[in-house]
Amino acid sequence: MLKEFKEFALKGNVLDLAIAVVMGAAFNKIVTSLVQYIIMPLIGKLFGSVNFAEDWSFWGIKYGLFIQSIIDFIIIAFALFIFVKIANTVMKKEEKEEEVEENTVLLTEIRDLLKK
C-alpha cells in the first residue's frame, strides 16, 4: 500500500499540481502586496484619500477593500491568462512536430509497400 501511494505521489501530474499550488500561493502574496502597498496608495492619492482601502466605507461596508480585492483578482486572472496562452502555444508546436513524424512514418510504409 505504501508502494502504491509512493507511485501515485511521484507521478508527474501530482507533482506538477503540488508545485502549481505552492507557486500560486506565492504569486498571490506578491500580487496582493503589489495591489495593497503600491497600486492602492496611488489610487488613494488620485482620489484625495490617504488610505483608499480603509477610508472608502459607508455604514461599515468597506468598499475600498472590495475594490482592492477586485483589482487583485484582475491582475491574477490576467497573469494566468497569459500563462495559459503561452502554454497552449508550446503544446501546439509539440503537436505539429508529432504530426510530421507520424506522416513521415506512414509515407515510408506506403513507399515500401509500393516497391514490392
Curated annotation (Swiss-Prot):
SUPFAM superfamilies: Gated mechanosensitive channel (SSF81330)
Membrane-traversing stretches: 7-27, 64-84
Topology versus the membrane: Multi-pass membrane protein
Keywords, ordered alphabetically: Cell membrane, Ion channel, Ion transport, Membrane, Transmembrane, Transmembrane helix, Transport
Keyword Zinc in annotation: no
Any one annotated GO CC term: plasma membrane
Any one GO molecular function term: mechanosensitive monoatomic ion channel activity
Top-level division of the source organism's lineage: Bacteria
InterPro entries: Mechanosensitive_channel_CS, MS_channel, MSC/AndL, MscL_channel
Cell location: Cell membrane
Pfam families: MscL
Family: Belongs to the MscL family.
Subunit-structure text: Homopentamer.
Function: Channel that opens in response to stretch forces in the membrane lipid bilayer. May participate in the regulation of osmotic pressure changes within the cell.
Protein name listed in UniProt: Large-conductance mechanosensitive channel
Organism, as annotated: Staphylococcus epidermidis (strain ATCC 35984 / DSM 28319 / BCRC 17069 / CCUG 31568 / BM 3577 / RP62A)
